[in-house]
Every structure is written in structure tokens, then in C-alpha cells.
A protein has these predicted regions:
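Membrane-proximal alpha-helical anchors
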Residues: 1-33, 38-42, 124
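Hydrophobic beta-strand residues in large extracellular and virion-surface proteins
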Residues: 11, 22-24, 37, 64, ...
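Short acidic, gly/pro-rich beta-turn/loop elements at beta-sheet edges
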Residues: 21, 32-34, 47, 82-84, ...
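Short, low-complexity, polar/charged sequence segments that are solvent-exposed and flexible
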Residues: 28-32, 41-44, 56-57, 91-93, ...
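Glycine-rich loops and low-complexity Gly/Arg-rich segments
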Residues: 34-39, 47-50, 60-64, 96-100, ...
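Intrinsically disordered, low-complexity Pro/Gly/Ser/Thr-rich segments with frequent PxxP/GP/PP motifs
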Residues: 47-81
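Terminal connector regions
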Residues: 68, 73-124
Length: 124
């Protein structure tokens, strides 16, 4: 089995119309089984009231279909950066394919790249 014949789970941040989301996506033709996502930092959302990383979706997604995306609202742009403790967040992502082969990857995010984007988003 080659890597192109395997699930590929990614975790990313999205800014959309001054709102911030986390996206969990299987960007392959193959399902991902028992997906677990471990962030290096808490991600505080909903006006500073909720640790988004406490959601069950980070503990286990039993089946993530091919090209399936789960998009989680975090907060408004300004509130998100106001409550953000660290701008660098890593995600350790664990999952398996249907044959039981396990995969692990680390996805590194530097959220500083998003800090000035709101000015461009507002203009559109």
C-alpha cells in the first residue's frame, strides 16, 4: 500500500467572513478509522467561554468518510485572537485505514499568518 492509497486526515484553521473555524478533513479516496486529534494547546472559543478542544470530535471519530469535512465554529475573528494564549498550535493526528494500518502525523500551525487577514476579508 502506498501513501496515495491511504486516508489523509488534516486539521486546519479557516477564516470566513470574520468567523474562525477548525476544519477536520479526510482528503483522500479512503476512509479514516478511529481518528484522534490531540492539540498542543487549548483553543478557547464562544467568547472565551468554551475550550473547543474538549469537544468529543477531538477524542475519537470512529469513521471519517472519504472527502468528508467536519467544520467547527470557534469564535468571531476578534474574540478568537483576544482569547488565544499561544499563536503556535500543533495537532497530533492519529488514525487507521480499514485494514488496521495506523498513521500518525503532526500538523503545525502558526496563527500569526491570520492576524492581519481581517482587513482584506472586510473589503470583499
Amino acid at each position: 500500500m502506498t501513501n496515495t492509497d491511504a486516508p489523509n486526515v488534516i486539521v486546519d484553521f479557516e477564516i470566513d467572513a470574520e468567523l474562525v473555524f477548525i476544519s477536520i478533513k479526510n482528503s483522500s479516496n479512503y476512509p479514516a478509522i478511529n481518528v484522534r486529534i490531540k492539540p498542543s494547546e487549548s483553543i478557547i472559543g464562544l467568547g472565551g467561554k468554551k475550550d473547543i478542544t474538549d469537544l468529543a470530535v477531538f477524542n475519537e471519530i470512529r469513521y471519517l468518510a472519504p472527502y468528508k469535512e467536519i467544520k467547527i465554529f470557534i469564535d468571531s475573528y476578534h474574540s478568537f485572537f483576544e482569547h488565544l494564549k499561544k499563536t503556535e498550535i500543533d495537532f497530533a493526528v492519529y488514525y487507521a485505514d480499514e485494514n488496521g494500518q495506523t498513521f500518525r502525523k503532526k500538523i503545525l500551525h502558526d496563527l500569526n499568518i491570520y492576524k492581519d487577514l481581517v482587513f482584506f476579508i472586510k473589503k470583499n
